Amino acid sequence: LISHKFSTVAPSGCFNALATIFDQWNDIQWLHDFFKANIDDLASYFKITDVNDAIYDTLEDSDKLECLILDISPDADLDELFRPLENSRFDERLLSKEKARIQNRPHHASWLRIYAIKLEPGKYIVTGGAIKLTATMQEREHTLRELHNMEKVRQFLVANQVIDEDAFVDYLKEL
């Protein structure tokens, strides 16, 4: 549950999705391999052709995003960071799919995304994250996998009647 404690509940069990994401985004070899494999997307959408530039930008954004997410100051507001997954959605929904990313990044938009299910205002369950180099998540296997994972987690929460923080805490006590 996120309100500055992060974990993901999935049918396969609990793990710290946030730690996994940031470990990956700070692994230079993993980033090098990822950007080499996705250089066409990086060049066409972001106009970046140097893998080293992409790695540097990712490390910088990852650090900033981690600081924003883990900010435990009284003024911290996760609702300012997370936005509806669908850019066209403006209404509140039960267990809505959300995304977080760095806003107002110089030179180009941030490609880092953290995906979560919103339990209630200020309370999120992180389901994963990705480097999104295309306009939609459906265009690439790794982002489509995150989309499917979000839906699996959402369906799991619905099936187990975990629709708010209290129900989440009760569910964890039963494990």
Give the ranges of each region predicted by the language model:
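Basic, Lys/Arg-enriched alpha-helical interface segments
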Residues: 1-111, 133-135, 139-175
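Short, flexible active-site-adjacent loop segments at beta-strand->alpha-helix junctions, enriched
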Residues: 10, 120, 130
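Short acidic loop-to-beta-strand element that houses the catalytic metal-binding Asp/Glu
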Residues: 113-116
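Active-site beta-strand-loop-beta-strand hairpin of nuclease catalytic cores
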Residues: 118-126
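Short conserved catalytic/interaction loops centered on acidic-Pro-aromatic/His motifs
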Residues: 125-128, 135-136
